[in-house]
Every structure is written in C-alpha cells, then in structure tokens.
Regions:
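Residue-level detector of functional hotspots within protein domains
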Residues: 1, 46, 69
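N-terminal beta-loop-helix "entrance" segment that forms/cooperates
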Residues: 32-56
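A sequence-level detector of short, solvent-exposed, charge-rich linear segments
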Residues: 24, 40, 44, 65, ...
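Hydrophobic packing residues within well-ordered alpha-helices of enzyme cores
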Residues: 18-21, 46, 75
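Glycine-rich phosphate/diphosphate-binding loop of Rossmann-like nucleotide-binding domains
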Residues: 3-41
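Residues that form or flank phosphate/diphosphate-binding pockets in enzymes
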Residues: 16, 44, 70
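Conserved small/polar residues in nucleotide/adenosyl-binding loops
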Residues: 89-94
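Glycine-rich phosphate-binding loop
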Residues: 49-87
Length: 94
C-alpha cells in the first residue's frame, strides 16, 4: 500500500512555504493531503491528527509554521511516523 504524505501548515499564510513541495508531490504522483492545524490555536486537533495519522494511511508528516519549530515538535510528540520540519525563512534570519 502506498502511504500518503501529510503536509501540515500552522496557518494559511504558510502556504507559500509548502506549495512547491505539494507541486512536486503531485508531479511525482505521490498521494498527499494538505491541512491547516496549529500547535497553538488548535492543539487538540493537531495532536489527534498526529495520533491517528498512521491509521489514516499516512507515512510521513511535513510541518511548516511561522518562525518557530513548535508545530513539528507537537506532531512528533504524538506520532511514531517521521516528522519533517520545514523552516520558514523570515526577516529575523540574516
């Protein structure tokens, strides 16, 4: 069975960070789903998604959110699947 990739954003403003990854997954015909889940605004929803990800057919979780790595950490704390944090470069990074 081919497992899906979960592409998780902390908010819709993180879309520019993940749209290239989604385009590449689509081009390679790799099944994926993109979701907006916040470690701060919707922590219970994020935790539940992570806990049930394997049972829902996911094999890896990509997380991109703001200037901090909290989202990837919140997901990694709630799943045994690989979680990859995608950094968002901002004004604070020089």
């Amino acid at each position: 069975m081919v497992r899906k990739v979960a592409v998780i954003m902390g908010s819709d403003s993180d879309w520019p960070v993940v749209k290239g990854a989604c385009a590449q997954l689509k081009a390679l015909d790799i099944p994926f789903e993109a979701h907006i889940l916040s470690a701060h605004r919707t922590p219970a929803g994020a935790a539940e998604f992570a806990k049930s990800a394997r049972a829902n057919g996911f094999g890896v979780i990509l997380c991109a959110a703001g200037m901090a790595a909290h989202l990837a950490g919140a997901f990694a704390a709630n799943t045994t699947l690989p979680v990859i944090g995608i950094p968002k470069i901002g004004r604070a990074h020089v």
